[in-house]
């Protein structure tokens, strides 16, 4: 039986420390603190429909055309490129408007591209905290 060698995970590259609130693990303390603020607003009725880690598809997966299998059934084509998705930290409704929120420490280039694609594809402007 082969065992996988486990690699030691050192400290986070951007010094973010994971935090646990209400049994939920957050990627940073800043995100956990924002969750507590939003949870309090939801309890007061200022916002509704608070969700975490909501996935938005920006570019769907790219596949080769469907093929006919040996028994005549349709078989999905070979995957060429995986989908490109943006995962929002928080999504909620405030004053009848959907708000998509992201807590950011460092604004990396891939995030900036995904932010622009969110506006282009879904017409949603991300609120950065």
Predicted regions and their residues:
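Electrostatic, structured charged patches in enzyme active sites and in nucleic-acid/phosphate-binding
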Residues: 1-129
């Amino acid at each position: 039986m082969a065992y996988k060698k486990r690699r030691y995970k050192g400290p986070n590259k951007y010094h973010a420390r994971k935090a646990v609130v209400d049994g939920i693990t957050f990627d940073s303390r800043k995100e956990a603190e924002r969750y507590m603020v939003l949870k309090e607003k939801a309890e007061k009725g200022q916002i509704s429909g608070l969700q975490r880690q909501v996935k938005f598809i920006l570019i769907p997966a790219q596949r080769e055309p469907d093929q006919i299998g040996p028994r005549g059934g349709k078989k999905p084509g070979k995957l060429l490129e995986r989908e490109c998705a943006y995962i929002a930290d928080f999504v909620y409704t405030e004053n009848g408007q959907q708000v998509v929120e992201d807590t950011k420490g460092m604004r990396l280039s891939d995030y900036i591209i995904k932010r622009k694609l969110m506006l282009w594809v879904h017409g949603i402007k991300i609120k950065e905290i």
